[in-house]
């Protein structure tokens, strides 16, 4: 995972002159935005006495530690120690490359030189973006698998906006092919064809009620992750304004409702019936949460009984398994290529909820 760029935070949620703690992939970092607006990711603790740097103060383009005032520049070099006469060149924090685009802050958290940033052309242009970053209380890999699982719509989401789109009236015919970027999966239910891309190692691209959607599932730790979701809509000025207003209104209703994760957990514990959530504004997340939380903290894959409808899951696991085997053997894993013009061509129509 650390060999790739990953989103780590929503751009709109980080003000200039602000530092805050960040936990991604089981590791703690400091995330900040300088006064000029540049987002940075660096080590979480001061070199002096180990205080969290997220409690410090952003001064121009540098960060001053809250405890004894040690100051660090964008390269991680300590530029000031107020109580000391000198500031050796060797005093350096580790910093991580960042790139900000499509409403998200991306970081490369691996060793060595960062690879080229992947093209995100399908999310860029004259359209409008809507970004969401929900925290999910289960393993990120489980969510990736669920996003490729077409059959679960017929059962998990039988009461949902998908029902209005003919998604549950018949089981899908499935095709899944390996590509230079990961997998291309097509499902067909009568006249409805739905295309979904899986881009290695943890991203899904689809059409979601008329908008292009790309989601990155980034682990916080083994039992939770953030689903960084970018929806992009092109159209007339009025169409874009209406769509954006609708998304914001839905987001406001979700924010005012009980958190989807808590509702899902209560259903799994037997405290609520599934039907009690039918009017929740984030119903799809509640339903997926029930299905995924009910698998347990760590799903038991050794005893799975997979079938032909799980072809997407089998192929995706094989891609991961091959890369991990190469790394274990000291071999260079496959270079995955995200095409600049990769666009999903079929999906849910615009009339969904």
Predicted region positions:
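Hydrophobic, proline/glycine-rich low-complexity stretches
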Residues: 1-4
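A short, aromatic/hydrophobic, helix- or strand-capping loop or linear motif
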Residues: 6, 10, 57, 103, ...
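Rieske [2Fe-2S] iron-sulfur-binding domain
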Residues: 10-128, 171, 350-353
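C-terminal catalytic domain of Rieske-type non-heme iron oxygenases
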Residues: 38, 112-353
């Amino acid at each position: 995972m650390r060999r790739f760029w990953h989103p780590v935070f929503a751009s709109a949620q980080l003000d200039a002159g602000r530092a805050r703690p960040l936990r991604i992939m089981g590791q703690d970092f400091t995330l900040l935005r300088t006064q000029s607006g540049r987002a940075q990711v660096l080590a979480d603790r001061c070199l002096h006495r180990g205080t969290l740097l997220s409690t410090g103060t952003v001064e121009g383009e540098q960060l001053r530690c809250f405890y004894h005032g040690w100051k660090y520049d964008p390269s991680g070099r300590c530029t000031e120690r107020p109580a000391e006469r000198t500031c050796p060149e060797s005093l350096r924090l580790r910093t991580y490359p960042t790139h900000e685009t499509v409403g998200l802050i991306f970081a490369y958290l691996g060793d060595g030189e960062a690879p080229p940033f992947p093209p995100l052309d399908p999310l860029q242009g004259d359209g409008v973006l809507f970004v969401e970053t929900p925290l999910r209380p289960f393993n990120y890999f489980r969510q990736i698998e669920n996003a490729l699982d077409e059959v679960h719509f017929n059962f998990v989401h039988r009461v949902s906006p998908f029902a209005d789109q003919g998604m549950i009236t018949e089981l899908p015919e499935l095709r899944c092919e390996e590509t230079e970027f990961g997998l291309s999966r097509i499902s067909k239910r009568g006249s409805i064809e739905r295309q979904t891309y899986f881009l290695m190692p943890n991203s899904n691209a689809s059409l979601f009620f008329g908008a292009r959607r790309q989601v990155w599932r980034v682990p916080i730790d083994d039992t939770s992750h953030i689903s960084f979701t970018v929806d992009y809509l092109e159209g007339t000025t009025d169409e874009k304004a209406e769509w954006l207003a609708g998304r914001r209104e839905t987001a406001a209703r979700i924010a005012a409702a009980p958190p989807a994760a808590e509702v899902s957990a209560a259903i799994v514990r037997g405290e609520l019936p599934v039907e009690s959530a039918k009017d929740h504004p984030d119903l799809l997340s509640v339903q997926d949460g029930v299905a995924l939380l009910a698998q347990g903290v760590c799903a038991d894959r050794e005893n799975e009984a997979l079938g032909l409808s799980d072809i997407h899951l089998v192929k995706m696991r094989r891609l991961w398994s091959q890369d991990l085997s190469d790394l274990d053997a000291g071999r260079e894993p496959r270079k995955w290529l995200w095409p600049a013009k990769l666009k999903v061509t079929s999906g849910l129509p615009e009339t969904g909820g």
